[in-house]
Amino acid sequence: MNTKLLMIVSAAVLAALGLLASFVPREILIVFGSRAEVLEILLVQVTGALYLGFAMLNWMARGNLIGGIYGRPVAFGNFMHFTVVAFALLKAVIAGPRPPVVVVGATMYGAFCVGFGWVLFTPPHSVARPAE
């Protein structure tokens, strides 16, 4: 699997979600029908900061061999994040009618869960670089 592509795409998605959660938390809460009060806004902003941190981690590790002995923590952290959120979103989808964005999110997180699971539980393959 091309881990560089996986890392770049996941970094872009997490950065977009993190920026949205950091700068428009009230609007996000309103879209999902939640109260837009101080504590809820703060929790969405903190979550946005976490997403931005993961995005930076993935962006900075994009050129490394992910899944090997040194890249395993990055793969495991991503796998854990995407798996837990995928199951939480799947549970919400199964519970009843949800906005389409929740279904799209569950699908997207499920795909990242599978991708990082593949990277984590299969041996890494280094890509031969052309000689300079």
For the regions a language model picked out, list residue spans one by one.
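Membrane-helix boundary elements
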Residues: T3-K4, L17-L42
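Membrane-helix boundary connector in multi-pass membrane proteins
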Residues: F87-V104, L120-T122
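Juxtamembrane helix-break-helix junctions at the cytosolic face
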Residues: N58-G71, V93-I94
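Residues within membrane-spanning alpha-helices of integral membrane proteins
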Residues: K4-M7, A11-L14, T47-Y51, A75-F82, ...
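Short, Lys/Arg-enriched, Gly/Pro-containing loop segments at transmembrane-helix junctions
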Residues: I30, G68, H125-E132
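Core segments of alpha-helical transmembrane spans in multipass integral membrane proteins
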Residues: A16-L20, E40-G63, F76-F87
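Membrane-water interface at the C-terminal end of transmembrane alpha helices
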Residues: A111-P130
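Non-cytosolic membrane-interface motifs at loop->transmembrane helix junctions
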Residues: F32-I41, Y70-P73, P97-M108
